Amino acid sequence: MRKGKRGGMIMNPVKVFSVAVTSFLAALSVSGQDSVPSPHEMRGPFPIMSTPYFEDGSVDYESLAKESVWVADSGCPGVIWCQSNDAIDLLSIEEKFKGFEACAAALEGRNCVLTLGANGTNTAEMIVMASEIEQVAKRHPHTKIAMISRPPDDVRSQDEIESAWDALGKISKRPIIFQTYGTKSTPTPDVKLLIRLAERHPHAFGYVKEEAAGWGANERMLQECAAKPPIKTVFAGWGGWQWLLQLRHCGSQGLVTERCAYAPILAEIWRRYERGERGVELAEAYAMYRLLIDQRNFPGGLRGYSLYLLNKVGACRSMVSRQYEDAKVTEGGSFGAGRKWKLTTTKLNDLQKKELDCLFKDMMDFVSKGKTAAL
């Protein structure tokens, strides 16, 4: 340093720049940059958690945190909350914020991407959710955090979807998975729109949960995967009913589904895929998964008999669900309208429970043998 004409101290400009850069990098770390997952980490099975409730219908945040750890410890590279239709629509904003915090705290230091739902009845509400997720990331810099977003409920055109997600891309510091299905009233975003947004906001976009109906999902997936590198990962949806085909032939490198009770077998499928298996080794793991989710004479839906397995691993303490007052429950999820809900309880008989116990053991034994064989 040297003195100026007025006796003040003049810093060496190189040192000033060095200090400024150090301060800037420190600020980035504090602001949640450490929590930003890489594109490579945004691949594989990302199960959506089923929200656990107490008997009175209030959210069981302790069990929610345990559920996130169950998925992470099972080997899945990511876990999602809250993104099921009923969770998006029937939880209050305050309940979502509290759940975000519980999951982020539970996954501190774990090698699993916590992907939180940035959704809303309109763009403004979606931005509120995304802004809170960024705040959660600041408070938990050692938790890898991403977002997932479906089109806001009030959009009715491609231009409106683009405008909404463009606003989201401008405020997000982290990857965002586009969910192509919103509600029965929102249009499916065009593939060209998804590519355009990925090119415009490459730090955030380029991840797609493809949810077109039936065979159309495969056709769109091929188009999306052909648009790499702006498009980075295309996740299968709808329970993974076509995931084997999509892994082998359509370029899918991930799955988003509310099947977190089966996290161990989903992780095993992915491990086999990652080590290059494309034949019977991959098919048999997928067949085990399909067996587990296809007990058709049991209480169905994504919150049907799966809740029993979540209770079994300590990720849930009841069989209670919030349900739309006018709900239509299918294997694809719970569908309804509005924010009013009722409580329902999934009931199983002794024989059903006995078989689920056997199936759970089958899954865990299969996964254990798979890990041993890979050594």
Describe the predicted segments one by one.
Residues 18-27:
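Bacterial N-terminal signal peptides
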Residues 35-188:
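Active-site beta->alpha loop and helix N-cap motifs at the rims of alpha/beta catalytic domains
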Residues 75, 111, 134-141, 201, ...:
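Glycine-centered loop/turn motif at secondary-structure junctions
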Residues 100, 126, 130, 194, ...:
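A general structural signal for well-ordered alpha-helical segments in protein cores
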Residues 167-175, 182-301:
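Catalytic alpha/beta core domains of metabolic enzymes, predominantly
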